């Protein structure tokens, strides 16, 4: 099943909804980075959140970066998501596993707080027009959903609910995705609707289970979560779009980046290693640069000096 993102409204247009399925996308990230169970879940949640944030950008080439900077053993993470449905990312420690925690109902879950530790969520929105918008908020839980909701409230003054979840077993990742809920400005002036939406969001239990049951049928997920709010997908080309893991790195860009190192360092690299091997943090692609290629770069720098 292909991953997708759905935009919808509810309560007669007073509520904005965005739902995303990222199962195949996160599986690809896990394969590329050889991620542990915990790091798979953390990165997957951030990918879903990044895509949902990017979905509201007005320009097709707009992008959102989420960076978790913290003192926990995960050593942070980074996600780059686009309005076009592409996303990539990495974690600081792709092998991290911690003992699970048990909630009041006896269910086991990942210890996101211990993995993330204390720190900040940094968000950058770039629409390609002038300087990107940057904002930083303190981490709330490390589970990504609450942290992104805090960003939306404090940095964009938009009260929101952000749900992210997954189903994972010792065999594979079964499902992954998220749901963004926002009340629109005019509807925010209706206390009864605000109270009803708040109540419905608090009543959502086992979001991961609901997501898993609905699969990529995100319209069914919206009805399952908000049956009495009449959720309806948008009636235009933006109602639904595909989502996939995609990295913009290329060999040409990577080789060109070597020029920034300067002649002295490149000459030292040539003498010691006879070439270079470049690795992209976002997708783990490796690019090998031969000795003659390095010599050509050194000559190019010499000619320009």
Curated annotation (Swiss-Prot):
This is 33 kDa chaperonin. Under oxidizing conditions two disulfide bonds are formed involving the reactive cysteines. Under reducing conditions zinc is bound to the reactive cysteines and the protein is inactive. Keywords: Chaperone, Cytoplasm, Disulfide bond, Redox-active center, Zinc. It comes from Parasynechococcus marenigrum (strain WH8102). PANTHER family: 33 KDA CHAPERONIN. One of its GO terms (biological process) is protein refolding. InterPro entries: Heat_shock_Hsp33, Heat_shock_Hsp33_C, Heat_shock_Hsp33_N. Its main location: cytoplasm.
